[in-house]
Every structure is written in C-alpha cells, then in structure tokens.
Amino acid sequence: MLEILKESLLTCPMVKREKDGVVYNYFINPLTDGIPEVTAELLRDVTAAMMVSLDLKNVDKIVVSEAMGIHIGTALTLATGIPFVVIRKREYRLPGEVVIGQETGYSKGTLYMNCVHKGDRVVIIDDVISTGGTIKGILPALKIAGAELVDILFVVNRGSPDIGIPYKTLVTIDVDENGVKIIDSAF
C-alpha cells in the first residue's frame, strides 16, 4: 500500500519558487498539483490507505478544500458512499455560509464553507499540509457551523505544523535541491 504514491513523490519534477525574497524547492506531484496526470492507480492506492487510516464510522460528510482536495474527496466518496463538501474559493451567499480566512505559506485569501450543518459528523481530507494555514482556517469554521470533527488526514505531510489537534498523514516528506525524500509512511 502507498507504493504508487511513494514512487510518484520520489520521481516528481522540482522547481525553484520565490516568496518574499526567499527561494525554496517546490515539488510538482499529481496529487498535490494535478501535474503530471493523476492516474486511476494512484487514486486507488491513496483511497485504500485513507479508508484504512480514517475513522469513517457514522461520518456524515467528507470535507475537502478547493482545488486539490476535490479529486481525493471524489475518490473517497465513490469508495465509501459518504458525500463530500468542497470548501470553495468563491462566495455563494447561501444561508449558513461560513467565511474562512486562509493564509498559507504560498498565498492569502478567503474560503467559503456551505452544506456543513449543526450535528454533522465530518472528516477532513486534504492533499498536503506544510504550514497548516488552510486547516487552521477550516477548524474554527466547523465549530461555527456546529459540526463534529471526527478525523483529519493529509496525504502528504511536509513540515509537520502544529495545528492544535492531532491529525493523520499517509506520507511525511522532506524536499531539498536533490528532490523529495520520504521520511515516514503510514504503510
């Protein structure tokens, strides 16, 4: 399990990026960037690991963040029958919409959560955690909505940030000028 994910990480392209004068190494992977193509085999590999790792008992909804959580949310929904909710970058102004401030290591913006209601039992899944900025915005939004958080899982962990509560990861990596190194794996 996770051999396809690990291979995709170890062989993925790297680019240099810059933010605020700091140059850093950025890995480009199908699950975290949609480039190169996301294969069915990779999604099956990750979905099988998520199903074993997550507490999905009595879960009402899977919560994902736009955009790179959508494909893993779709795969997990197809495998479990549990519907998923996308936290969007666009405001819809629906009743009960929760506005989320988001600041990551790469960007700053606003997200919008709909269709999560009081008493919903939810799991959050996302492609990668590096600074924790996205999840730190989502957690208070779930409280505002009155949802019960059952579990959190990130496919890739780069940085192990403290988000105030425990979370699960499938693969922990480090990235340097030579590429991705796998530090730890759930399987």
From Swiss-Prot:
GO MF annotation terms = guanine phosphoribosyltransferase activity; hypoxanthine phosphoribosyltransferase activity
Q: What is catalysed by this protein?
A: IMP + diphosphate = hypoxanthine + 5-phospho-alpha-D-ribose 1-diphosphate; GMP + diphosphate = guanine + 5-phospho-alpha-D-ribose 1-diphosphate
* Gene Ontology biological process terms in this record: IMP salvage; purine ribonucleoside salvage
Question: Which UniProt keywords are present, listed alphabetically?
Answer: Cytoplasm, Glycosyltransferase, Purine salvage, Transferase
E.C. designation(s): 2.4.2.8
Q: Which domain of life is it from?
A: Archaea
Q: Quick one: which pathway?
A: Purine metabolism; IMP biosynthesis via salvage pathway; IMP from hypoxanthine: step 1/1
**Which top EC class is given?**
transferase
Task: Answer whether the UniProt record assigns the keyword Transferase to this protein.
Answer: yes
Q: What is its main location?
A: cytoplasm
An annotated GO cellular component of this protein is: cytoplasm
According to its UniProt record, where is this protein located?
Cytoplasm
- Family in the record: Belongs to the purine/pyrimidine phosphoribosyltransferase family. Archaeal HPRT subfamily.
Subunit comment for this entry? Homodimer.
Q: Tell me, what does this protein do in biology?
A: Catalyzes a salvage reaction resulting in the formation of IMP that is energically less costly than de novo synthesis.
Spell out the protein name for this chain. Hypoxanthine/guanine phosphoribosyltransferase
Q: Which organism is it from?
A: Methanocorpusculum labreanum (strain ATCC 43576 / DSM 4855 / Z)
Q: Which gene encodes it?
A: hpt
